[in-house]
């Protein structure tokens, strides 16, 4: 089991990422397979963590055909402090994905810098600002507007670096450095 580097008192990275998906998206229901895809884990691993959370009373579930849909229970006294911890430690991926889903003019989005290093398993302190690369035609002003609430939720600045598709493909010293360092592509729909 891969240990958590972002919030080390959690049992595993899977547990932290699962909690972040659920509690930072409280209005959404997830199937176990969607959760597994989103966090890059196996369905049995997600099933195990979901069972623990359900049995402890932290999530709700319902069935829709063969699908088991789960969502965070927001009526517990632990929700506010847990959500704050998750936003500060695991938050950038699910919060930014939610903020940019459906946005026009975005081809790809990725996190790089110290947050990407933590996601790739490098140890170190909790990162400060979030380095976000955006490939596409959306303007920086549009992106800033879309990410305003995400900044508040995360309690961090988001430093946006914009690239056109052609500039990303052609490369530059900065792009080459990003490509050769840890970077994490987000799943934007």
Set out the residue ranges of the language-model regions.
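Catalytic core of pol beta-like nucleotidyltransferases
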Residues: 2-51, 55-108, 116-127, 135-189
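Active-site glycine-centered loops adjacent to acidic/histidine catalytic or metal-binding residues
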Residues: 113
């Amino acid at each position: 089991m891969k240990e958590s580097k972002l919030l080390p008192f959690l049992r595993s990275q899977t547990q932290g990422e699962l909690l972040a998906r659920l509690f930072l998206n409280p209005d959404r229901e997830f199937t176990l397979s969607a959760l597994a895809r989103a966090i890059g884990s196996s369905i049995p691993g997600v099933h195990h963590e979901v069972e623990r959370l359900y049995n402890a009373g932290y999530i709700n579930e319902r069935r829709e055909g063969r699908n088991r849909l789960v969502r965070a229970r927001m009526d517990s006294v632990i929700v506010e402090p847990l959500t704050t911890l998750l936003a500060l430690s695991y938050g950038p991926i699910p919060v930014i994905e939610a903020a940019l889903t459906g946005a026009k003019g975005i081809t790809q989005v990725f996190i790089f810098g110290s947050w990407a290093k933590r996601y790739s398993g490098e140890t170190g302190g909790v990162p400060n600002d979030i380095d976000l690369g955006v490939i596409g035609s959306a303007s920086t002003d549009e992106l800033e507007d879309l990410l305003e609430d995400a900044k508040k939720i995360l309690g961090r600045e988001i430093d946006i670096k914009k690239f056109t598709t052609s500039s990303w493909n052609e490369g530059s010293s900065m792009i080459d450095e990003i490509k050769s360092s840890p970077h994490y592509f987000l799943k934007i729909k």
